[in-house]
Amino acid sequence: MTAQTVRSLINQVEIAVSAAIDRVLPEAAGADPVVRPSEHADFQSNAALALAKRARTKPADLATAVADALRADGSTAVADVTVSGPGFLNLALADATVWTQVAARLADPRLGIDLPEQSRRTVIDYSGPNIAKEMHVGHLRTTIIGDALARVLGFLGAEVIRQNHLGDWGTQFGMLIQYLDEHPDATWHSDDLAPGTSTVSALDSLYRAARKEFDADPGFADRARARVVALQAGDEDTVARWREIVAESEVAFRQIYDRLGVLLEPSDSAGESFYNDRLLDIVDELTAAGIAQDSEGALVVLSQEVTGPDGDPATLMVRKTDGGYGYDTTDLATIRYRIRDLHADRLLYVVDARQALHFRLVFETARRAGWLTDAVDVAHVAFGTVLGPDGRPFKTRAGDTVKLMDLLDAATGKARATVAEKDHALTDDDLDHIAEAAGIGAVKYADLSTSRTKDYVFDVDRMVSFDGNTGVYLQYAHTRIQSILRKAGDMTATVDVALALHPAERALALQLDAFGGALTEVARLLEPHRLCNYLYELARAFTDFYEACPVLQADPSTRANRLALCHLTARTLRQGLDLLGIAAPERM
């Protein structure tokens, strides 16, 4: 089946209203028709309020003239138009128009969704855990927000390049490698660990021991520093051990990504070490252009746009006084590489809001260097913090950072108890499968349904609830529809456009038609919570429809139309959840 774009009903109405405005007020040609969904009609236009001054008339009079023009045009999109209030146009669609739209979307493998991002190459930087350290709650938001954006933009046609900027370089590796060499009995390889024990957990503990020895033993500290030099110089044995640590860590990260349903692959990894050979070029280029300058032995870029608390220009550290490089230089190398080598049209950095100043300075420097031009869009996709019940950054009772795997285990355990209480007939295997889908989905949805710039409290009890705006509620809505369709068996689900619409059918059909618009808003604003809100409203509209409109007990023609609505709702929910990286179970 070939995909075919279906023009949304709201867009059809916008075109009709715009044409009527052009006839009544030619000097306002191209003005926004300001069409929005309405509780008083299918859609409402407020354009007359904004244009009345230009027309030198009252908004109500202009609205009446536009309504007359709409009727005269004989628009197939607008069946009825009335004027209310100070000049609102209330616009109603013909029942046949709505049913035709349902049939068109149902017939299309992509639900009729357009490809507005087609041919746009978008590089998304997200997740970025540190090698030899466990992923913790701080990695949750970047990983799932970045993945959701990658999915949505890819579905809308963008060529998405995922970049996992691993923290895989630095002095800490010299310390860890030296400790491992001096303690050959240390257990940390995945094959040697007990089931359920993570390589990165073992390495993290060994690093802490190495740090303790580094601080207590000057001799070990000297040997660790020498090991750093050996690593940077490419010493064969040291590099081999470093690569071993990186490979084992990536296996552990893969377990988290697989469990979260994240699309990142090993080929998407381009850590700090990847850019090592490019750092000197960055220094030379910025120095030659007069952008970087000496500051007490260090090389810095003084901002022309941002000042610090003391009123002096904010600085970006290009090279330290000891000749080393930090993440400022590495991030400059990433942006140049992604523009010059990956040929990005759009760059997205899904990173904690606390890094806002850093990215302002990196983007400014890249523009001054000529790497970042108006042909490339760049954005720091900032996000807030996951909080504990006390309203502070989420920690364990001992004050440690919460491990991401522990957090997921807690959610799936709670989901298992909740699902078991609702359905006592489930087998243990079914219960485990459903609990994993519900628990992981609950964690992801709770995060994604929160405006990304806001902090939110991690409340697992609320997350796994079957009530309210939760992932479990949406998953359960999908399973209810699947139950109806299983009972329907081979019953026909074709659309008869001549049938009258029940108000609940109409509300559901209009909500289904708004799916593409919600996705476009996510892509434009980089805010996944808008898709969550859409899906929640869709599930609510289906609940209202199901309570008001019998499906299987209806007469054959009505039943066929209502089954078509069920099929389209299930497909839309399933597609929407998939774009969030959340499973849509058949049973629950």
Swiss-Prot record:
Gene3D superfamilies to which the protein is assigned, alphabetical: Arginyl tRNA synthetase N-terminal domain, HUPs, Isoleucyl-tRNA Synthetase, Domain 1
PROSITE patterns per the UniProt record, alphabetical: AA_TRNA_LIGASE_I (PS00178)
Enzyme class: ligase
Gene giving rise to this polypeptide: argS
E.C. number(s) listed in UniProt: 6.1.1.19
Name of this chain's protein: Arginine--tRNA ligase
Localisation per UniProt entry: Cytoplasm
InterPro entries: aa-tRNA-synth_I_CS (IPR001412), Arg-tRNA-ligase (IPR001278), Arg-tRNA-synth_N (IPR005148), Arg-tRNA-synth_N_sf (IPR036695), ArgRS_core (IPR035684), DALR_anticod-bd (IPR008909), Rossmann-like_a/b/a_fold (IPR014729), tRNAsynth_Ia_anticodon-bd (IPR009080)
Record-level GO cellular component terms: cytoplasm
Catalytic reactions on record: tRNA(Arg) + L-arginine + ATP = L-arginyl-tRNA(Arg) + AMP + diphosphate
Signal peptide: none
Principal location class: cytoplasm
Family statement drawn from the similarity comment of this UniProt entry: Belongs to the class-I aminoacyl-tRNA synthetase family.
Protein keywords: Aminoacyl-tRNA synthetase, ATP-binding, Cytoplasm, Ligase, Nucleotide-binding, Protein biosynthesis
Subunit structure: Monomer.
GO molecular function: arginine-tRNA ligase activity; ATP binding
GO biological process, one term: arginyl-tRNA aminoacylation
Domain of life: Bacteria
Coiled coil: none
Extent of motif 'HIGH' region: 129-139
UniProt keyword Ligase, yes or no: yes
